[in-house]
Amino acid sequence: MATLSEKEIRDRFNQKNIPKDPLWIEQAYSKSLPYEIRHLLCERLGFLADKGWTSIKSLIKKHGGQPELIYAVGICHQIEARDFLLNQLDEQKDLDINILKALACWGAVLNNSQLELILKSKSQAIRIAGLELLSFKSHLLHETELLELVNEPLKDFRDEVVIKGIKILQRRNEDAVIDRLKQLALNGSYPIAEQALIALGSIGTKYSSRQISELITQLDIKELQQKAKKQLSVQDIFLDRINN
């Protein structure tokens, strides 16, 4: 196949005339193309699953682990592709955000040591990617393991990281998890406290209800006290429905 120009490839995408032949896409790919076009081509390869994976491997061998190629590895959903990403993770000297994002849906296969290493990173992007990985495994962990893994992210000075961790904890209903959420409601910034209250309200146990009730008098900010009252009201309705 003759080398296609950027304009020809763009025109094909605009006309929805991209062949479903992975070899065609592989041959159309070039590092000289703008990132947007390379990403579209690799995305199409990823969507071709096992057929696309063969071409993705070939392109990585030729061009290395370009971000768009690693993205394609993640979305092709092949076991061999997953193993490739896990090997890359273990072999990396420095954590690669592209590898972590590509592994997202396979978070459950990472071991606790791998997750701990990722979540201890100082990088916001890497911590958030690590929490996304953890979200696929959190239901498999004892609450002590889970709390240990989210300990560093929950102490992060960036609200976005802490809130991501809170959203993982709110899927659990153990007393230790509820206690940690209560601490965040008391000691965190306004957005963190607000999210912690929402998490406590969504858990729906008698213990979480008691902690919310205590927070109503312990919180210093009136708006947060009102939000705690609202969560308590919602939870009381939920508990009444369960009991009846």
Question: Which sequence ranges carry the predicted segments?
Answer:
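Short acidic DE-rich linear segments
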Residues: R241-N244
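Structural detector for internal amphipathic alpha-helices that build alpha-solenoid repeat scaffolds
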Residues: A2-N17, E26-Q27, Y35-D50, S58-K61, ...
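Buried hydrophobic core positions in alpha-solenoid tandem helical repeats
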Residues: W24-E26, S55-K57, F84-L86, Q114-E116, ...
